[in-house]
Each structure stands twice: as structure tokens, then as C-alpha cells.
Amino acid sequence: MNKNFQKFLSVLVFVVLTKYSIFALNPTVSFNKGKECQNQEDWYGAIENYTTALQGNPSYGEAYFKLAECFYAIDEYELAITNLYSASKLIKNRPDIINLRGFCYIGLGKLSEANEIFLSVLKDFPNDVDARFGLAELNILNGRISGAEKEYKQALSRQNTNKKALLSLALVSDELGNFVAANNYINQALKYHSGNPEVYYFAAYLAVKQGNLEQGESRIRTAIHLQSDLDKAYKLLADILYKSNRFEECIEICKYRITLDRELSSAWFLRGLASKSLNRYEDAISYWQTGLSIDPNDEIMRSALELLALEYTDIEDPRREEWALFHIEKAKDYEKKFYSVQARYEYQRALRINPLNQEARIAYAELLLSDGFKESYLSQLQFISDQGEATQKILDTIEGYNSLLSNTLSVKWNINPFYLDKKRWNLGLYASEGKTELIHMDGTKIALDFIGDLFVSSNTINANVDSKNVYNFTAAFADARKKGYDYFCILDFTESEREVSGKISMYSGRNGNLVSSWDVYRTGNDRFVSALRYFVTKIESSLPTYGEILNRKNSEILVDIGKKDGLENEDTTEWIVVKKGAIKTADVGIGITFLESDILGYYSVEEIGEEMSSGTISIKGFYDKINVGDYIIPVDTVTPVEESLENKENTEKEVSADSKVREPVLLELLRNIKN
């Protein structure tokens, strides 16, 4: 159970129990204790004390308001609104109470209602800056950053030393690319609030974002000097040290954070990442395992652990059994909900980590069978048998299916489909010159490596990952062209506490033309992996399918594409046979081109298996030049020369269904600024 959720439940139980207690403490004492907890961001302790104060004095309006602030801080917006309603009955016409209701409506996705509240406050209180802050948030949510800048400037014009206005303008100006203005606002904030650690924290953040690590380190150390228990400052310092390749110092800061609070999974993550950079792989694995025991749902940490385990540990390593078990349990949960696609992925992931896990392989085989892939089902059971782990039931099943499938194409042509190399496309994967990462350092690189690992199971794509460097377009294109990639992709990835978003842009490896791009946004559980799987699916489906002739008997040929490649019974697709080595990618868009003179004949599909198909050929012209190794290509994937002059760039956006309001990372930063 989530740690914060446990705390929340305990507080609710406390509220219910103390409601009828006759031993309530002095309301003022409890209220003051609540304020102390709130100032230290101990929201649950504050809620407990404010609730106690209200037991002693049910008409304590300020306690209701403070209670609402705490519920707002832990995203319990409905409870916050309930307490604001109680506060407003006891405290009349106070704008901060009204404004907080507006912010709660933003959290609930009721943007129009929030807008009305902030405008009503400004009508009665034209100089109220919090209402301006609310309107600024609404502008950011609607993608109007310049509109937010205007509201923050209005607030600053009314209070020219307001800390939140100055810091907000610095962040917004930086987002707009106006770095001179951003630094000017930060310098003003440092001038007027020189003793405030939060100001130095954001000053350090902007310095790092603009590439000035030395200045960022100086400022964040000042923040720590001003407030020695400011954990987010220690985290940023550790991030700076990591980015500066000072891994030993980074580890020391992480160790210090852990001594203060062993439940800080972010400290375990970065400690593991720095250890990996020092080639201390066992240490990294140990730290990440500890971090995942604290937060099992940290997908990026789990991905980093699995990627390192695949690279560093032996297949027989007993720890792989434990790492695979996580995915097996998730798969079982999905099966209970009849989510077969998700269950299949989790079993595949378990087998990627531990190929020897019989439970996962049998379950995966059963899913293949339910989808009608009997040959694939049999191959999975034969794998178990080859490892010497087959039970008598499995051996009997293998015998039965060998008899049942005795007339398949693989038997007729004596070719084992398990060993077919159907990789058609060479794809380069690069990380963009990304944004400053606040939660997981190297999150983009880990995402890129994970995408590459997902492509391992692809039938048609050979993915080549370069996650050690960051690239702009020019550098990525030069590298892709040098290595002869058909296409190359550049990943841009961003995460916040609750969301991930990303974009993959795909370009021609021959000429650098943008051929397609995909945007994704996810929130909720499994958002990281879900977003990356979306990218992989889109890239796979965008690339044309074509086959290779495996064998020939007179006019009959065997081709290495089948049901798993999208062929269906009674296939009516027009196929052409093209000379081996004669095809190339289209000049513009995604497609295949070749010379008319390289067309050797035509192909008609007659029998379709899971991995292969067979049919008859007819030759073009007088001479039969069709040989094993030549290509068969669907006519609809061919890009005529005249179409290659048209721009076929495609852009798609995917938003998760459980999303109410998309909240940019910028907004998360702005909300963290205290008034």
C-alpha cells in the first residue's frame, strides 16, 4: 500500500475517533502545533492537529481554512472544498478562502468554474495577487504561457517585491526562451529575499537548466546553508554533482539523504545511477532493489534495474527469478480483468528477464494459443522440453500438437520458423538534447534504452540505440547516414510527479527528411512503459511489410511472412517480386522505391502459416530471374517517383484516457513556490 495513502487513512481514522472524544486539547495549542507541522510540510501531522483544534472549538474558522490548505497540498480537493465551505460560513468575504476554492477546481479539472472564481475575486479585490496567480495557472494549462506571463507581471506591478511573482516570472521567461529576463527576475528575487532558501533553490535550478552547473552548485549550497534540512536542495545538489561527473560526491550526498530518511526512493535511485557510472554494477543493483522495495511503482528505476540486469548478470542468476516475478504477478492481475494484450506484454517481459521461467512461458504459450497461434504455442513448449524441464503433461501435449501440425508449411518445406531472420529495417535511436530532469536523472536515456529493449522482440526492426550521448538533429543525421540506417528517431521525454509526455520524430536515414512524428501523454499507473510501448507500436506499424523468398520449387515459392506479419486468409493483396538489394527507402515519407527494371515478376498467396506463406509466381518478360533471397513487396507500399516529391510528414498525438487536465512540468514548478 502506498505510504502516503496509509498516512491518509490513519488521519481519517483519527478524525472519526476524535470527533466523539471529550478529551480534546486546548484548540489554540492544537492549532499552533498544526501550523508548525504545516510549515514543515508535514501535512498529515498538520491535519491531525487542526482536526483536534476543531474538536475543542467547532467554530474555529481559521482551522477549517488551514485544514483545507493541507488537503489541497495532498491533492484531496473535494475534502479541501468541504472545509473551505465551513470556513467561509465563519469568515466572511476573505479572498484567500475564495481563491483556494478556485485552485481546488483547477485540480479537479473544472477550469471554467475556477476562472469565474478568480475573476470574481479581482472584481471585488482588484489588487489581489493570488487571483492573478490562479489565472496564470489557467493560461499555462491552456498552453498560453505568454498569457501567464502577463498575469504574473500584473501581480508584480501591485507588489513589486512579491517572491512568488518574481520566481514565477523567472521560470516563465526561461520557458519562453527569454533568458535575459529570467535572470533579471531571479536577481531581483535574490536581492529582495536574500535570506530565503527557496529563492536560492529556484535560482540554482535555472542556472542548471541554462547549463551553468558551477553557478547552480554555488546557489544550491547557499540554500542548504540557509536551511540545513531542505531535502529538495540536497537532491538538486546530488543531481548537479551527477551531471558534473562527480559520482563519488553524488553518492555521498545520497547517503546523507538516506541517513535522514531511508524511505527516499529518489536517493536510492541516484545512488544506484552514480554507482553504475563507476562500473559498480552490484552496488547499483542493490541500491535499486532497495529503492523498489520502498516504491515498487517507480517504473524508471525498475527499467534501469532490468536493463542493467540483462546486460550484466548471467541468465542463471537466481535474482532474475525475483525480478521476473513482479511481471508475472502483474500479468495474472491483467488476466483476471481479461486484459490479454497487457498480460501478454507482462509475460514477455518476465521471459525477457528470466527466459528459464517455466510458469511465465506456459502462461505466455496459452495466450498465443488463445489467439490462434498453434505453431507458436508448440514452439514455446518445445523450448521448455529442450531445457529438460518438461513434465509428462507437456511432453504429451507436444506429441499431440506435432501430430496436429504435421501438414504445416514448416514441415512441408523443412524450415524451422524459430530461426528465421526477418529483420528488414535498420533503425537508429537517439536522445535529444533534453530538458533539465527533476525527478529521475538520465530519464530520457533510460527511456531510450528501454525502447531499444522492447524492439528486441520485433520481427522486422533492428534497433540501434545510442543512449550514451545526446544529439541534435544534425549530429543524429550524420551518425545515422554514416551507419547506413534506413530511418532514425530522436526521442524527447519529460516527466513530472504524476505524468509523462514524450515525442519521437522519425527521419529518413538517407536524406534527413522528417517522415513522421508521434506525441504521447500518459498519467496514472504504468504511464512510463505504456508511453514507450505506444512509440514502439507506432514505429512498427508505420514501416512497410515485405518478405524474402526462402525456397522455390518450380513456380511455387516459400516466403517469410505470415499471419503474424498481418497476412490474412484469402489474401487479395497484389505482390510484386523485386531483385534482391534493389530497394531503397522513399525520398519523402515512409515507403519503398526501386527501378521498374528490377521488377522480376508477380506473386499470388495461396497458403498462409503463422510465420511463412507460400504461393505461385509468374515471371515478367521472357526470362525467369527469380531466385531465393529476392523480395516480395505489396504494391500499396511502393512509393511512385512522382509522389516522392510530396511532403508526407505525419504527426499523431496520443493522450491517455484517464487524463483530466494535462499539467506541464512548468506548472508543477510554479505550484511549488510558496507565497
Regions found by a protein language model. Name each.
Residues N39-T52, A73-S86, G107-S120, L141-Q154, ...:
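Structural signature of tandem alpha-helical TPR/SEL1-like repeats
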Residues N26-T28, G61-E62, R94-D96, V129-D130, ...:
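Helix-start (N-cap) detector for alpha-helical repeat units in TPR-like alpha-solenoids
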Residues G56, L90-I91, D124-F125, R158, ...:
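Structural marker of alpha-solenoid helical repeat scaffolds
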Residues S218-R221, K255, L270, N279, ...:
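Surface-exposed, polar/charged interaction patches used for macromolecular assembly or partner binding
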